């Protein structure tokens, strides 16, 4: 079972927007973040969720924990593609219907109850975003020194067998019901974590096109009204992150809706966590829709980095992934911009192919990115996936936010949620 937690809400902070970048300055002498280790989803059926990501997104099953490994109340499947690991965990017993003499530990009982409550409130959703760090104890201790309320699981060593070694973990609370596991693998060589066994995807006769992903690029959290700064304060105070990038409702708006966004980054810039909140508009924004159907703040989307977005999106479309639609007017305007603005790079992908695949382009003078977003992956209009390719450009698609918002607003209107 991947480390998880019973959450406590973070204390209320000021909702005043920071006025300068140095309000979240880079801090020296802090433990290093190595990157995203894995993302844990709590879902109703872990086996089906793993199969879904394997089939549509080209992941493969690499590890398992369940009844056969001695886990009597939870099942987890770990799927991977490149440096990306998703863990899908489900309860396999009803907490409300356990017999009085059920030999369940207090810890498992509390976790089983929490997991069912999480599923009822959020549906299938991201529960934990795990960071690999070089010193679990130092990161955890700083976090709880700043805010004792974020403590979920103190540092502990998960013992493996002699052949594979052990890992050190801790868990802290972030926005909503979301947690961060801090993990140091210390040379651990097992398939995922101690307690998991290696498992492969069942053989298939389908000839599906391969998908090669690289890593998690960023992970976006949506907040309710006036909660963005409080969430960013947590990352600055507890994890020594700094403000990497920000935009406000004057930049990210359409005729109907708007948002504010701040990207928080680890000191070494290997982990970036954009934080969004709604801003006033004529109608309901995508951020408001998310918060309503997620029943509170949570992870809105996970961006997956690829070296070849054309091949990746082509393969995903062939496998059945449903992406947002981008109107032809976007590409007409983009073609004019690319033809008239000065820049030090040339587009490495065929423009007509990008248009055919509805891939978005954002850039500055020194580089560019290509990106595309799936439609929500669940019946609730909550979590989705972004596919992104970068070329000397560390932005987050601000130039596409208006087009993206308009595309999502069309989907919202179809759902009756605009």
For the regions a protein language model found, what residue spans apply to each?
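Active-site-adjacent "gating/activation" loops or surface patches in catalytic cores
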Residues: 199, 268-287
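N-terminal beta-strand motif that seeds the catalytic metal site of vicinal oxygen chelate
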Residues: 3-47, 126-131, 189-232, 295-305, ...
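Core segments of cupin and vicinal oxygen chelate
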Residues: 2, 31-86, 145-146, 155-163, ...
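Long compositionally biased, domain-poor regions of proteins
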Residues: 271-275, 292-377, 383-391
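Extended catalytic-interface subdomain
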Residues: 89-91, 106, 114, 121-255, ...
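Vicinal oxygen chelate
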Residues: 34-44, 77, 99-142, 171-172, ...
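Terminal substrate-recognition subdomain of acyl/acetyltransferases
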Residues: 2-8, 13-15, 181, 363-374, ...
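Hydrophobic, small-residue-rich alpha-helical packing segments that form membrane-like cores
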Residues: 2-39, 43-45, 50-51, 55, ...
